[in-house]
Amino acid sequence: MSQTANQKAKRIPLGKDASTKRRLSKVRRHFRLRKKVSGTPERPRLVVNRSARHIHVQLVDDLAGHTLAAASTTEADVRAADGDKKALSAKVGQLIAERAKAAGVEAVVFDHGGHGYHGRIAALADAAREGGLKF
């Protein structure tokens, strides 16, 4: 059974649709960033993971492979806060700054995980800076 010209035109090869390209582009950006960014005990990596609904942040010492502190919008005190996703991201930035200070961390290397530096990512970074972290 052969396909008509119209059916052939509509076929998209596997892995070539828009969502796959977008995801792979993000992965490539993150790999490029990770080649340059590494966390140490004195200056750990501030890793940001963003999904459509939540944002997660970790302080990672790459040499030892340990997470020093973490914060997320899934925590009860952040969920109780009012505001949009950008405001909740700023709250997470304040939380990670407090927890970093408690862990004895003053300066961090920012790893935005292949995401663009705007919106929720920028709000989180600005709040962490206001909380006393040096990027």
Swiss-Prot record:
The keyword Ribosomal protein applies. One of its GO terms (molecular function) is structural constituent of ribosome. This is Large ribosomal subunit protein uL18. Pfam families: Ribosomal_L18p (PF00861). Residues 1-23 are annotated as: Disordered. GO terms for cellular component: cytosolic large ribosomal subunit. One of its GO terms (biological process) is translation. This is one of the proteins that bind and probably mediate the attachment of the 5S RNA into the large ribosomal subunit, where it forms part of the central protuberance. The keyword Methyltransferase does not apply. InterPro entries: Ribosomal_uL18_bac-type (IPR004389), Ribosomal_uL18_bac/euk (IPR005484). Belongs to the universal ribosomal protein uL18 family. Part of the 50S ribosomal subunit; part of the 5S rRNA/L5/L18/L25 subcomplex. Contacts the 5S and 23S rRNAs. Gene3D superfamilies: 3.30.420.100. NCBIfam families: L18_bact (TIGR00060). Keywords: Ribonucleoprotein, Ribosomal protein, RNA-binding, rRNA-binding. PANTHER family: 39S RIBOSOMAL PROTEIN L18, MITOCHONDRIAL, LARGE RIBOSOMAL SUBUNIT PROTEIN UL18M.
